Amino acid sequence: MARKYFGTDGIRGRVGQFPITPDFMLKLGWAAGMAFRKEGKCRILIGKDTRISGYMFESALEAGLAAAGADVQLLGPMPTPAIAYLTRTFQADAGIVISASHNPHDDNGIKFFSNEGTKLPDDVEAMIEELLDQPMTVVESAGIGKASRINDASGRYIEFCKGSVPSGTSFKGLKIVIDCAHGAAYKVAPSVFRELGAEVRVISAQPDGLNINDGCGSTHIAALQAEVVAQQADLGIAFDGDADRVLMVDQYGAVVDGDELLFIIARDLQERGRLRGGVVGTLMSNLGLELALAELNIPFVRAKVGDRYVIAELLARNWQLGGENSGHLVCFQHTTTGDAIIAALQVLMALKRRGQSLVEARSDLKKCPQVLVNVRLSGAVDPLEHPSVKEACARVTERMAGRGRVLLRKSGTEPLVRVMVEGDEESSVRGYADELAKIVAEVCA
């Protein structure tokens, strides 16, 4: 059954436009409290990224939860994976994240974690949606929930991240630049890498509520590229606003994407006999990743785009490693969800074990040229079902003669159609992508 409010990654939209409004968040808090409350009280953790609207929505959610009889513990600005970890280790009934991830400050959203620090099951989301359509009530005065703050949350998470590498590990002699996207990782990420011995230069770590993801972070990586070269650093690490995505930059300023990072981690695990099963990618994963893993006899399967689908496929197969080329990387040997800091640490450990630079480590993956064009979606027409779009896709696929792929899909978080073309020659791939994007745009006009 189609969900009314929840998308592929929770509830997300423009601040001030339904459902990203204070009154809806009040009702959402109440509905969540009612859904998680079993017999008597329940306890819910709330964390957020650094966007200014987070304070407003935190208060609204807190009030709604209290009205349902739920106690609330506030974490303040924290990476999304930290909230998953703390929900589990504090044995809370659920965790709530206030974030729109890599989106600009005027967007925001809500996502939930179960008591195990995993994505919320579909049946629980369905229960919350059902409650949202019912009248809001308030428990008896004596049963109203209480709110408190957890003051040592950052320190707990920093130690957890450091614990994902072997005891005694030192990155002394490694010079890195970290781009925190003016987001949730601005305090914890520099501390993790510094405490492990690395020389750290930090950029985009002065959040003001409005500058999150603004020309920085994993979606705007040019500033990090320039800083790595200027500082003559060994590599750069870029997080997004809620630190569940990571990309890297090598010493020459070249971007190392999620496919390449996934390959480096997978090869390291296999060489140490620690890789359980294979690797899960997505429909957007580069064909080069699939071929490179095949050379290592590592199984590879593709899930739908979205970390929730990668995670679902990993769980179904009892595998432990998966991710997206956008930088969502899931290392189940350490975490219950995608964690950018921990994924970056696994890459650094792989480099350390092999005695390689990032340039050397990525060289065994030969990526096929891939072009992605985003087309703004407007109107009621579904371009993916339009005859002219289908005919164009078939025509391009035929012209590529089995030497490439065409994929059109709607974004799960933004009003966009993503047009992806992959093949063995960049100029033709670009031409095909532009051709398809033009047709999609005409249909959407």
From Swiss-Prot:
The gene is glmM. It catalyses: alpha-D-glucosamine 1-phosphate = D-glucosamine 6-phosphate. SUPFAM superfamilies: Phosphoglucomutase, C-terminal domain, Phosphoglucomutase, first 3 domains. Activated by phosphorylation. This is Phosphoglucosamine mutase. It comes from the Bacteria. Its cofactor is Mg(2+). HAMAP family: GlmM_B. Binds 1 Mg(2+) ion per subunit. Keywords: Isomerase, Magnesium, Metal-binding, Phosphoprotein. Mg(2+) binds at S101, D240, D242, D244. One of its GO terms (molecular function) is phosphoglucosamine mutase activity.
